[in-house]
Amino acid sequence: MRMLAVATIALLGSATAALAAPASVSVSIGAELQAKAAKTLGVREVNDLATELRKTVERQVAKNPAYDGARIELVLADAQPNRPTFKQLSDAPGLSYESFGVGGAQIRGVAIAASGAVTPIDYKYYESDIRWARRGGTWADAEDTFQRFASDLRRGERVAAR
C-alpha cells in the first residue's frame, strides 16, 4: 500500500512538471553583425555563435520556473573574437592564429513572461584586460559574455541597459 502511495505521488509530480512548458528562446543576428560577418568574421562562425547563445540561455532559464511559458527573443548585436576567425585567416595569409586580443559581445532583445509582461534586454560585456585573452579560443570572451548574461537572466537580475 505504501508503495502505491509513493508511486502515485511520483506520477503526479512528473505530470505537473510535464505541464510546465520551458521558455522559448530565439536568437537572431543584428544587421550590423551580419554585415561584419559577411565581410570579415565569417557567416558560419557567427551563426554558430548565435546557436551557442541560444543553447546557453535555454540551459540557464530552464533552472528557474519563473520562465516557464516565457518567450525570450534575443538579437546578437555585436561580437568580437579573441583570435582570428577562419575567414580572417584565409583572407590574410600572414595572420597567425597565435594572435590574440580582447573580445566580447552585445545582446539585445526582450523577455516576454507567460503573463505578457515585457522586459527589455540590453547586455554587453567586453573584456578589458588583454592578459586574460591568451587563455581561450577564438570566441572565449563572447562565450563568457553569454554565460554571464544567461546566469544573470536566470537569477532575475537586471539585464537592461548594461
Language-model features, listed with the residues they occupy:
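Functional cleft and adjacent loop/helix regions within the main domain
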Residues: A142, L153-R162
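Sec-exported extracytoplasmic/periplasmic mature domains
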Residues: R54, E58-A62, A66, R154-R158
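A structural "domain/chain start" motif
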Residues: G13-L53, G69, L76, N82-T85, ...
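Short secondary-structure boundary motifs at beta->alpha junctions and helix caps
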Residues: L33-Q34, A38-V43, A117-D152
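Extracytoplasmic/secreted envelope proteins and their assembly/folding machinery
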Residues: A50, R54, E58, E143-A150
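Short structured motifs
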Residues: V43, E58, A92-G94
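Gram-negative bacterial Sec-dependent N-terminal signal peptides
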Residues: M1-L19
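Surface-exposed short loop/turn segments
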Residues: A66-V118, S128-R134
